[in-house]
């Protein structure tokens, strides 16, 4: 089990901004599974992921198009996925999509979507 967060590298975000956006993605994924009517399978994956130490990986995407392509593939594969839009209070324009979160889910399923991406 793992979670992947994909971060756009075409935006001029500082390290702190990136860290905050990655945290937003991770928290949003968990909240979506816990608070909404999500698939029973997702709840099982969440529990397994928590018991395995909550492994996460942060990866680079070149731009919005690549981010949305990976996000849509995750949804089509049956994985939990979320998009993070910035509030625009500091470095980025309001509503800018900064990152996407995928998972938690089976490592193989996530790797099939993100295996070509580099670590941030």
Swiss-Prot record:
Per the UniProt record, which EC number(s) apply here? 3.1.1.29
Per the record, what is one GO cellular component? cytosol
Keywords, in A-Z order: Cytoplasm, Hydrolase
Question: Record's CDD domains?
Answer: PTH2 (cd02430)
- A Pfam family assignment: PTH2
Keyword presence, Transit peptide: no
Q: Which organism is it from?
A: Sulfolobus acidocaldarius (strain ATCC 33909 / DSM 639 / JCM 8929 / NBRC 15157 / NCIMB 11770)
Q: Which GO terms describe its molecular function?
A: peptidyl-tRNA hydrolase activity
Q: Which family does it belong to?
A: Belongs to the PTH2 family.
User: What is the protein name stated in its UniProt record?
Assistant: Peptidyl-tRNA hydrolase
Q: What does the UniProt record say this protein does?
A: The natural substrate for this enzyme may be peptidyl-tRNAs which drop off the ribosome during protein synthesis.
Query: PANTHER family recorded for this chain?
Result: PEPTIDYL-TRNA HYDROLASE 2, PEPTIDYL-TRNA HYDROLASE 2, MITOCHONDRIAL
Which reaction(s) does the protein catalyse, per the Swiss-Prot or TrEMBL entry?
A: an N-acyl-L-alpha-aminoacyl-tRNA + H2O = an N-acyl-L-amino acid + a tRNA + H(+)
The record's subcellular locations are: Cytoplasm
GO terms classed as biological process = translation
Main localisation: cytoplasm
Q: Which domain of life is it from?
A: Archaea
Gene coding for it: pth
